[in-house]
Amino acid sequence: MRLDQLLKHFSYESVQGSHDLIITDICYHSGKVKRGSLFVCIKGQYTDGHDYIMDAVKTGAFAVVVDESCMVNVRWECFIYTEHGKVRVHELVRNYGMAVIGVKDTRQALAQISAAFYDYPAKKLKIIGITGTKGKTTTAFLTAGILKEAGYKTGMVGTIWTYNGKDVKKAGHTTPESSDLQRELAQMVSNGCVCCV
């Protein structure tokens, strides 16, 4: 998907660099970046994605989404300040041909970008959410089983694993990050699921 198309689906404060880039993946972990990725810098409990911008650049990211509060303009030059020092935005744009997008909330931007990138898969599924203190997994399995018996191909997202209508995958986190969830929902749609529990 072209970056200029993605830009229509989320709020941003600034964009420096080309809008014509073809984005092939959305990543929030620098170790998963490949050529063509859009890397979203997420501040976590222990690490900050802004500290890994250059790692993402070196492994092929075409664009980076940063927290606007990390960007500082000094004498006609813009820097992204990280724990490891500063990164010159101009160098990312000029030397690497990247786009740098400043947003107020990178986590919210990741959710909006991912939904658009995967063509809003949640809108194509009947989503059944289960909350509570005890019995969620049992209730999810029973619900999915009832739907299956009724003829509805059903995917599942759980704390231990996900099922996309074809394959079972171990869950990376008890609560998936928005881009991971959108990717799984898109796979469910691709595999013919009509429901997700």
Language-model regions, residue ranges each:
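N-terminal leader/targeting and accessory segments in enzymes
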Residues: 1-112
